[in-house]
Amino acid sequence: MSQTVSPPLYAAIDLGSNSFHMLVVRHIDGSVQTMAKIKRKVRLAAGLDENNALSTEAMQRGWDCLSLFAERLRDIPKENIRIVGTATLRTAINVDIFLEKANQILGYDINVISGEEEAATIYKGVAHTSGGSGRRLVVDIGGASTEMIIGEGFSAKALTSLKMGCVTWLERHFKDRQLTATNFNNAIEAAKSTLAPILDSYTDIGWDVCVGASGTVQALQEIMLAQGMDEVITHAKLKRLQKQAMITERLEELEIEGLTLERALVFPSGLSILIAIFELLEIDSMTLAGGALREGLAYEMVDEFRQEDIRARTIKSVQSRYQMDVSYSEQVAVVAQTLLEQAGAETWVSEPQAGVLLQTAAKLHEIGLTIDFKKGGEHSAYLLQNLDLPGFTRAQKHCLGELTRRYREQLTSLPEQHAISGTSSKRILRILRLAILLTHRRNPALEPEFKLTTDDNNLTLTLSKQWLADNPLTAAELEIESNRQTDIGWPLNIECL
């Protein structure tokens, strides 16, 4: 009996200045699927002395970590492994000593990449894992360097690696471990001085959106969500977190709701750098990218990926993996879009992301049926909130889950979420449920002609009297849906011509 061959594994290892990371993925159903993530805090940059020589202790921390990584590499083809060193290994004058033993431990060569190459690879990781359109400014704050990239689609237009990071700024500006206004101001002003040479060229190129691709940005988002804020980072929120940090006098005693102990040590220094970037470049807002350097390395090894629309690729991969009815999901999406346009896509639901989430929910709402029909909505919600979905943020995944949880039968109010406004999420849920009812026969030729009109929160769906008479089951279900929406304060009228 023949055995099915598992898809090959790929490993990307990033020997960073603060942490060493390993990402193990496989290529399946047109997507890169994460199989393992391993991270160890080594704080390599903290081992650099005034002459940029790495201490034996810092090198030993790195070697100990690589001994753990080596076990995981044994089962991965050599051609599917990429290992890179970044800022601290670029800087260390005794890097050859570290690399010689590191190569022996791993059994593979380590490539110490330039700052520009690091920036280019980071951008690839962002482009392959983050949704949205337009020109991006990408910010990645590492342990000893900060990469700044402007790009559009898969093409980078400006690449810069700056010699500042959360570990080096910690040792330089918070050496006394005091969280004072003076230390914060010194760290922020020093970061601005480091950024100044690129200010004119970057503002001349310009950007439409800004994304952060670092542990610092991830930590900030976790804190904001824990404190009931949305996931969008703004200057006001950064200054608010600075004030929270300064309540504690000493860094070792720092406690902020949502901040993990692991991230606490380099949080003030990373926060200072990000505040400087926001102020000098006059950034309005920033969101978290879906990936960065390691993801860029992984996607470079899998040369299939050139599709521009990351979200479309993700949806296609999920539909294939879970054997979904693609024709029907497309039918629901088309009807949902028609209903949205009739309601007023730019007025009744004004947020562009709401339309994206409606389309995605329409195409993936039946994913839970692969587990069980009875609780299909619950299973859909769980899967969409927990699957790796490149192109969608955590808040967007949460919103998708709550929409698909309620795609049929019993209707309850939506809980608070941070992807779009409560009004928009409520309205696209109403449209999703109507689209599913109008397409339940799963054949576009059997769809009725319909017209949806709105009066603020009141919906009126008009259909042919003859069609309703010829389709009594659908007519009854629409009447039930009218009662369900109206009962929770979402008035829905079904009228016939």
UniProtKB/Swiss-Prot annotation:
InterPro entries from the UniProt entry: ATPase_NBD, GppA/Ppx_hydrolase, Guo-5TP_3DP_PyrP, Ppx_GppA_C, Ppx_GppA_N, PyroPPase_GppA_Ppx
Pathway(s) this gene product operates in, as recorded in its UniProt entry: Purine metabolism; ppGpp biosynthesis; ppGpp from GTP: step 2/2
EC number(s) per entry: 3.6.1.40
Enzyme class (EC, first level): hydrolase
Gene Ontology MF, one: guanosine-5'-triphosphate,3'-diphosphate diphosphatase activity
Biological process (GO), any one: nucleobase-containing small molecule interconversion
Catalysed conversion reaction: guanosine 3'-diphosphate 5'-triphosphate + H2O = guanosine 3',5'-bis(diphosphate) + phosphate + H(+)
Signal peptide: none
Any single Pfam family the record assigns to this protein: Ppx-GppA_III
Keyword entries, A-Z: Hydrolase
Similarity comment: Belongs to the GppA/Ppx family. GppA subfamily.
PANTHER family documented for this protein: EXOPOLYPHOSPHATASE, RETROGRADE REGULATION PROTEIN 2
Role noted for this protein: Catalyzes the conversion of pppGpp to ppGpp. Guanosine pentaphosphate (pppGpp) is a cytoplasmic signaling molecule which together with ppGpp controls the 'stringent response', an adaptive process that allows bacteria to respond to amino acid starvation, resulting in the coordinated regulation of numerous cellular activities.
HAMAP family membership: GppA (MF_01550)
Name of this chain's protein: Guanosine-5'-triphosphate,3'-diphosphate pyrophosphatase
